[in-house]
Amino acid sequence: MNLLDPFMKMTEEQDKCISDAPSPTMSDDSAGSPCPSGSGSDTENTRPQENTFPKGDPDLKKESDEDKFPVCIREAVSQVLKGYDWTLVPMPVRVNGSSKNKPHVKRPMNAFMVWAQAARRKLADQYPHLHNAELSKTLGKLWRLLNESEKRPFVEEAERLRVQHKKDHPDYKYQPRRRKSVKNGQSEQEEGSEQTHISPNAIFKALQADSPQSSSSISEVHSPGEHSGQSQGPPTPPTTPKTDAQQPGKQDLKREGRPLAEGGRQPPHIDFRDVDIGELSSDVISNIETFDVNEFDQYLPPNGHPGVPATHGQVTTYSGTYGISSSASSPAGAGHAWMAKQQPQPPQPPAQPPAQHTLPALSGEQGPAQQRPHIKTEQLSPSHYSEQQQHSPQQQQQQQQQLGYGSFNLQHYGSSYPPITRSQYDYTEHQNSGSYYSHAAGQSGGLYSTFTYMNPTQRPMYTPIADTSGVPSIPQTHSPQHWEQPVYTQLTRP
């Protein structure tokens, strides 16, 4: 029995090592490694037998078990074991280490592991009752108390092992457990899907934040041509190809309509002056028709209601936006807001300058520059009302036909905005007032015929409604004396 004591202790220690995975253990690969002999401890002096037996040698267990079982049992066991091919048993390290068939290569031991492995053997030999976890804690405490000179042998051995490991496995790459990588993959997918869904919204919020400073925030972020395949909505991330399926475009449009409607008084989020209607792909325009515009009615701000009297400067301009012509600037019919997207109007500064503030001073320069499709009667200075009035019925309808969004004809709004249909198709009452504006009637020819818009140099600088508090708006007294409020009321209350 005395002879077998070392073997008994050794098997106990190895069983502990196997059962206690979290602690640093002497496992398969390290058992045959040069570390035990070269670890700088006196392990091999105190227990020379240890290195002669690789761990798990079946003979070792047989010897220790021989006195426990009768001979017949031992013979039966040995007979069974002889007939079994042990190569069929998967090595536990390989099973855990990788899903592939190649054996798992362990990391080279660091200095502490060299120390812990050597010391654990000695301590387990001297105190077999110690639990492996307690042993590991103690080894860690002792390691922290060692000074540099005491640690040096372990550090040198660890460096030697590292160099040897590099020679043995030149292309070794440390790969943490696969379980984490699965979680990472899932989170990446989730992030990716969030990216696709959220990015338009996030960009919108950013644009809304920017919009007071620059109404051209989008044209600054992306050149207008960059998204010509999509409606001029919030820019999608640059990687998105132009020819996206129209679904994202539609979502963007819906999302876009909401900020337009809610931020009715804000300056436009999109500056269309640099956008050419030709850049919009026809399929985007045609797809716009499928929108259910009725859902946007709920977003119409109360002060935008057609019935608002024209005397509140800012409010009236906003109410004016509901004219069919005002499609660019407001939720007006949401449908018309879409029209604005289609023919990127200079966002009629949807900041709709209060119509009575409508830049009378610019009337002179607006005449020639008026090629912008007059989509907003109020925006034009009084001198141009006659042209608008006289040409608007035919040309607005013509314009709608060109855009081909029949579903947005104001018939959708017939019930809720009876005045719109009236003012859209029947401008006689405004034409009667043409005497006020007859002097500018001659210039109207180019008004609607072209969809080109004034470049920034030609555009009159409007004061955006959102900034009416900060930016002093043009005093109403500037409006021409002959332009009387009642006429304006008719104009802004389509």
Swiss-Prot record:
Q: Which UniProt keywords apply?
A: Activator, Differentiation, DNA-binding, Isopeptide bond, Nucleus, Phosphoprotein, Transcription, Transcription regulation, Ubl conjugation
User: Which SMART domains is this protein grouped with?
Assistant: HMG (SM00398)
- Give residues where Phosphoserine occurs: 64, 181
Q: What is the effect of changing residue 64 to A?
A: Abolishes sumoylation. Abolishes phosphorylation. Reduces ability to associate with UBE2I. Prevents trunk neural crest delamination. Prevents cooperating with SNAI2 to trigger neural crest delamination. Abolishes interaction with SNAI2
- The UniProt annotation puts the region (Dimerization (DIM)) at 63-103
Annotated region Disordered: where?
1-66, 159-275, 326-402, 462-494
Compositionally biased tracts (Polar residues): 378-387, 470-494
Reply yes or no: does the keyword Nucleus apply.
yes
Residues in cross-link Glycyl lysine isopeptide (Lys-Gly) (interchain with G-Cter in SUMO):
376
Q: Which GO terms describe its cellular component?
A: nucleoplasm; nucleus; transcription regulator complex
Pfam families (UniProt xref): HMG_box (PF00505), Sox_N (PF12444)
What's an example Gene Ontology biological process for this entry? Answer: lung smooth muscle development
Which residues fall in a compositionally biased region of kind Pro residues? 344-353
What does changing residue 61 to R do?
Decreases cooperating with SNAI2 to trigger neural crest delamination
Question: What triggers or suppresses the expression of this protein?
Answer: By BMP2 during chondrogenesis.
Note down the stretches annotated as region Transactivation domain (TAM).
224-309
Cellular compartment(s): Nucleus
Q: Subunit details for this protein?
A: Interacts with SNAI2; triggers neural crest delamination in a phosphorylation dependent manner. Interacts with UBE2I.
Q: What is this protein called?
A: Transcription factor SOX-9
Which organism's genome codes for this protein? Answer: Gallus gallus
| Highest classification ranks of the organism | Eukaryota, Metazoa, Chordata, Craniata, Vertebrata
